[in-house]
Regions:
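N-terminal Rossmann-like FAD-binding beta1-loop-alpha1 element of flavoenzymes
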Residues: 33-62
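Glycine-rich FAD pyrophosphate-binding loop
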Residues: 54-79
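Helical element adjacent to the flavin cofactor pocket in flavoenzyme catalytic cores
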Residues: 228-290, 294, 298
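Mid-domain catalytic core of redox enzymes
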Residues: 2, 6-17, 33, 272-388, ...
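FAD-binding beta-loop-beta segment adjacent to the flavin cofactor pocket
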Residues: 376-382, 431-465
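Extreme N-terminal leader/targeting segments of oxidoreductases
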Residues: 1-37, 55, 507-518
Length: 518
């Protein structure tokens, strides 16, 4: 795919966002020539691939081992101690405005994105008492980064004077994959230490984001950190504005998309884990589940790291020894905890819907769900209570009960009015299924295309040479996986959008080039 200047339906406000056109081809498959495609994994990546393939007329079967779609953003029904039926999920996720391809997927069933609601700010608070806000920060780079520095109490003039400006220059011109070639061998912590960011700013502005990768910044590749800075600060004028679903994930996002897929003729098989994928002579593969085997002309593997490792290990006919070793080398991030607590009284009206935290013994953020989610708001209105969610990423030690208790104690510390609140009920989600991007891992990440022309990969663990991350990487690789299969059959794929793939201006690019002129 190549960037084009031709007009396309805009996906955001940034006039420098780039559009990537797919290979030319027919609009869809002709009747009678539709290939059969198995998409294995019903998370964001799998849903993106399945949706595009079904729209182009392919005969799609979507396999998902869980009983609902959404992958790591799925939800399940549960009954509380007060008899209320509610949805439990992994909770707060920010749908940033520069997640163009993810938002494009959601527009299939919600053209105006009316089921997303904006949050006014992304406040960050350190245990030392300092708080940062992005509400008044300009959105256009480089004024966004400069505005954050000027407005932030964590940056003093002495701190700015002590910073190593030359070491920070690579932030001004982030390119993919070059950023990995230069910085994948360096940890995020080492890079920040080299820049000499103030320690409080280090914690608030960077550690909070690096832990969004569910990783300790001492282990995370600095390339991922630079990419984050590009996506949110210096590469995009969308800024740190984001939306959240106004109902639980299943109702707002995945059930409508599942219905859409079925209307397109796709066979959606939830509660159906795949055991093996074995190549067939002449192309395609046989997909085996507990109920038997089915032959397909093409396959998309859109799985989390553990499931991908397991399926490839059980399917000895896939790939080369080196490719299989690379799959086996994909690491999973440390466990994380989402605690959702239903309280008998509201939190203070001044509390934000979301608060990022640092220095609070492992507590990474607090969400007040009844500020933005309809189901939680209705429960709070009916009971007079509130629904609060606590996240802890990269949990490496401690008994689960102790960690859960510790998060509640930190909530009491940060929001003292909760100390006297009665806990009506609580749910705790412990998971360890997100990819880890440690130092030096980029070269071994699997690509979308494989040596089998009928097999593609998708997911946020898959290498993507575009400036995307997290949910947007999942959606983008899902579309790329489908595009590759469609292009091989002469059918046009999905138009993709991305934040600029280099520094936004000649000045920024020239300054960034100084970092290599040593």
């Amino acid at each position: 795919m190549t960037a084009q200047a031709r007009p396309a339906a805009r996906r955001g406000r940034d006039r420098k966002a780039e559009v990537l056109m797919p290979a030319p081809g027919r609009d869809r498959f002709e009747p009678g020539e539709e290939p059969s495609v198995a998409v294995i994994g019903g998370g964001i990546a799998g849903l993106a691939a399945a949706t595009l393939l079904a729209e182009r007329g392919a005969r799609v079967t979507l396999y998902e081992r869980e009983h609902s779609l959404g992958g790591r953003l799925a939800g399940r029904r549960t009954r509380l101690a007060d008899g209320s039926d509610v949805t439990m999920s992994r909770g707060f996720h920010a749908f940033f405005r520069q997640y163009y391809n993810l938002r494009g997927l959601l527009r299939r069933t919600d053209p105006g994105l009316d089921r997303l609601t904006p949050l006014a700010d992304y406040p960050l608070r350190h245990s030392g008492g300092l708080t940062d806000s992005f509400a008044r920060v300009p959105r256009t780079p480089p004024f966004s980064a400069l505005g954050f520095v000027v407005l932030s109490p964590t940056f003093g003039w002495r701190d700015l004077a002590a910073m190593n400006a030359r070491a920070a220059l690579p932030l001004l011109d982030v390119r993919v994959p070059e950023v990995y070639e230069r910085f994948d061998h360096v940890s995020a912590t080492r890079f920040l230490d080299g820049v000499n960011f103030p320690q409080t700013a280090h914690h608030l502005a960077f550690e909070v984001f690096s832990r969004s990768f569910f990783a300790d910044p001492a282990e995370l590749s600095a390339a991922e950190l630079l990419l984050m800075f590009h996506i949110y600060f210096l590469g995009s004028s969308e800024g740190l504005l984001f939306d959240v679903p106004d109902e639980p994930f299943p109702q707002a996002l995945w059930e409508p998309l599942g219905d859409y897929l079925q209307r397109l003729g796709a066979d959606v098989r939830t509660g159906t884990p795949v055991d093996t994928v074995e190549p067939r002579e002449g192309g395609g593969a046989e997909v085996r589940t507990g109920s038997g085997a089915t032959a397909y002309e093409a396959v998309v593997l859109a799985l989390d790291p553990g499931a991908l490792r397991q399926l490839v290990a059980a399917s000895p006919g896939l790939g080369t020894d080196a490719w299989r070793a690379d799959i086996d080398a994909i690491r999973t991030a440390p466990p994380f905890l989402v605690s959702r607590i239903w309280l008998d009284r509201p939190v203070g009206p001044e509390r934000p819907a979301f608060l990022g935290t640092s220095g609070y013994d492992g507590l990474d953020n607090i969400s007040v769900l009844d500020r933005y989610e309809g189901e939680a708001r209705r429960w709070a209105a009916r009971t007079g209570g509130s629904v609060v969610e606590l996240h802890a990423y990269a949990v490496t030690d401690g008994r689960p009960e102790d960690v859960q208790r510790g998060l509640l104690e930190r909530l009491h510390e940060i929001y003292p009015e909760t100390r006297d609140a009665k806990v009506i009920d609580a749910r705790h989600e412990w998971r360890a299924d997100c990819p880890l991007f440690p130092v030096g891992s980029y070269d071994r990440r699997p690509r979308v295309r494989t040596l089998h022309p009928w097999l593609t990969l998708a997911g946020d663990a898959v290498r993507c040479d575009l400036p995307v991350a997290l949910m947007e990487r999942a959606a983008t690789t899902g579309f790329l996986a489908a595009n590759a299969l469609l292009a091989a059959r002469g059918v046009r794929g999905q138009v993709l959008w991305t934040v600029p793939r280099a520094g936004r201006s000649p000045v920024l690019r020239a300054l960034g080039a100084l970092a290599t002129a040593r």
